[in-house]
A protein has these predicted regions:
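Active-site-flanking segments in enzyme catalytic domains
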Residues: 4-13, 19-252
Length: 252
């Protein structure tokens, strides 16, 4: 009956007499934080051959993300796999999952920017599983509804000078019928891609290594007149919105 209780004796002396009262104290229930480091909810499958640099990049990215914010303990676990991706220029991918298969992230072991790539793909994961509902990405819902928690962040992204440069070039490519360029422009302007690139840049503010990875992609895409990232001053209001969103969730 008292298997989880501990007997205690209270002794009181009064008027030359001694009174003893027996009572029981229950064990303190173990407490579990509602918010945990993101790395504690990730199952990393490191690569084997020729994967040392990518493995280190993934580990560094998770350590950096842990320094920036937490995630709810109830957030589903995400497998992260360091693999060979047979697509030139592709550093990683996020699979949103189905009823039959859970979500996962793949990071290319030969791309050279694994830390930045992991931050980008983890941004997709959070957009989908933390901020999204019913399988949707929160970034899309935030663009559609002013009441969504990502609404102000998404407005800041599309009002930025970086986004305007992409839109301006996209219109030129429409006029000139540059179809391959148009496809890339549409890709960059998709809400979930805007969110993931911005999330990676926000995280990279805590790590010079990650910032090199993120801005390397920026320099490459600038050559095609579609800059993927934001200049420092242009990004400042966006960073503040990320701070606000995660703070409102109690994750910072």
């Amino acid at each position: 009956m008292h298997s989880a209780l501990h007997k205690q004796i209270l002794t009181v002396k009064r008027g030359g007499r001694t009174f003893k009262q027996r009572y029981y104290l229950a064990d303190k229930a173990p407490t579990r934080s509602n918010h945990v480091p993101p790395s504690s909810k990730a199952d990393v499958h490191y690569g084997m051959l020729w994967a040392k640099q990518a493995n280190e990049g993934v580990a560094h990215a998770l350590q950096t993300i842990d320094k920036v914010h937490k995630v709810p303990h109830a957030l589903e676990r995400i497998p992260i796999k360091v693999v060979h991706i047979f697509k030139p220029g592709v550093g990683g991918s996020y699979f949103a999952g189905t009823r039959q298969q859970k979500s996962y992230i793949e990071i290319a072991k030969g791309h050279g920017t694994a830390a930045g790539d992991l931050a980008h793909e983890y941004g997709h994961f959070l957009d989908n599983k933390l901020f999204g509902r019913s399988g949707n990405f929160g970034s899309w819902d935030g663009l559609r509804s002013n009441k969504h928690e990502l609404s102000k962040l998404m407005r800041a992204l599309y009002k930025s000078n970086g986004a305007r440069i992409i839109v301006k070039q996209y219109k030129k490519d429409q006029t000139n019928r540059q179809y391959e360029q148009l496809a890339f422009g549409r890709y960059l302007l998709a809400p979930h891609e805007m969110f993931a690139r911005a999330y990676a840049q926000w995280i990279s503010n805590k790590s010079s290594r990650m910032r090199r990875d993120v801005m390397h992609y920026h320099e490459v895409t600038k050559r095609n007149l579609y800059p993927s990232q934001w200049e420092t001053d242009d990004f400042a209001p966006i960073a503040r919105e990320f701070d606000r969103v995660f703070r409102n969730r109690g994750l910072r």
